[in-house]
A protein has these predicted regions:
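PLP-dependent class I/II
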Residues: 1-141
Length: 141
C-alpha cells in the first residue's frame, strides 16, 4: 500500500547503507581463506580445460570460451533451431542439464546453449562422457 512505502524504504536502508557487523567480520575472514580459494580456483581451471576440449569432442564445436564465469556458451545453430527443445532432449537422453539460450537472449537464444562447469571435476568428466554418447547416438539416429 502507498502509505507503507516510506516506512519500508526506511527499514530497507538499514540493510543497504551498512552491512551488519557480523557480516563484515565474516567477509574479512573469507579473505583469509587463501588456501581454500586457491584449491577452488584450480578445480574451476581444470573443469574449464575439460569443457573446452570435451565439448568439441562431443560435437559442440562453436563455443565461446568463458571469460570471468563458469559457463561455456555454445552456438548450436548447426544442430537445432530450438534450444529449449534441444536442452530438454539432452536432459532426457543424456541426463545432463544445460540451459537454453532463450533464458538470456530472446532474439538469438534459440541458437545457443549454456553449459556450466560449477560442479566437481568428476561430475564434469561424467557429463562430457554422457554428452559424447548422446551426440553420437543422435547423429546415427
Amino acid at each position: 500500500p502507498p502509505d507503507h512505502v516510506r516506512v519500508v524504504e526506511r527499514l530497507a536502508q538499514n540493510m543497504f547503507i551498512c552491512p551488519p557487523h557480523a557480516s563484515q567480520i565474516a567477509a574479512l575472514a573469507a579473505l583469509d581463506c587463501v588456501d581454500e580459494l586457491e584449491a577452488n580456483r584450480k578445480v574451476y581451471a581444470e573443469n574449464r580445460r575439460l569443457m573446452l576440449s570435451g565439448l568439441p569432442e562431443a560435437g559442440f564445436t562453436r563455443i565461446a570460451p568463458p571469460d570471468g564465469a563458469f559457463y561455456v556458451y555454445a552456438d548450436v545453430s548447426d544442430l537445432t533451431d530450438d534450444s529449449v527443445a534441444f536442452a530438454a532432449e539432452i536432459l532426457e537422453g543424456a541426463g545432463v542439464a544445460v540451459t537454453p539460450g532463450l533464458d538470456f537472449d530472446p532474439v538469438r537464444g534459440r541458437e545457443w546453449l549454456r553449459f556450466s562447469y560449477a560442479r566437481s571435476t568428476d561430475d564434469i568428466a561424467e557429463g562430457l562422457r554422457r554428452l559424447r554418447t548422446f551426440m553420437q547416438a543422435r547423429q546415427c539416429g
